[in-house]
Amino acid sequence: MIPCSDRIIRNAPGPFDAEVVLDYESRLLRRKRLACAGGDFMVDLAEVASLEDGDAFALSDGRIVVVRAAAEPVLVVRGPLARLAWHIGNRHTPCRIEADRLIIRQDHVLEAMLRRLGAEISHQNLPFRPEGGAYGHGRTFGHDHGHAHDHHHA
């Protein structure tokens, strides 16, 4: 019988029996069969979860499998960061914010817009670990954040 996990250990301390490497999209899941060096296992969570690098699955056979963020194509953005971050956020685009750069997933439309705004952009392959959002762990699921308001997107 294939081992199963219905529990995530957030920011797991280790030690780990195996690791599973997932890209950003694959780290959003509820029910899925995953493969690691120790064999396949089934994830069966009560609700959809956004997994972060360092979270882990507690398997029914006692093993702990840590999640690692896979390297994937990203845009590394430098320039007037406050202005660039505002435009990225206005489009509800997941973004990693660092002291001297922003990191977003590759998108040719956003790349063209950011270049017009004065950004210097390089294409790299890095683990994508965007900011989690103000209203919950990991991603923001939709746009509802507990209050009503009107705003318009440019």
From Swiss-Prot:
GO terms for biological process: protein folding; protein-containing complex assembly; urea metabolic process. GO terms for cellular component: cytoplasm. Residues 135-154 are annotated as: Disordered. It is found in: Cytoplasm. The keyword Oxidoreductase does not apply. Keywords: Chaperone, Cytoplasm, Nickel. Transmembrane segments: none annotated. One of its GO terms (molecular function) is nickel cation binding. Its main location: cytoplasm. Belongs to the UreE family. Involved in urease metallocenter assembly. Binds nickel. Probably functions as a nickel donor during metallocenter assembly. This is Urease accessory protein UreE. It comes from Paracoccus denitrificans (strain Pd 1222). The lineage of its organism: Bacteria, Pseudomonadati, Pseudomonadota, Alphaproteobacteria, Rhodobacterales. The gene is ureE.
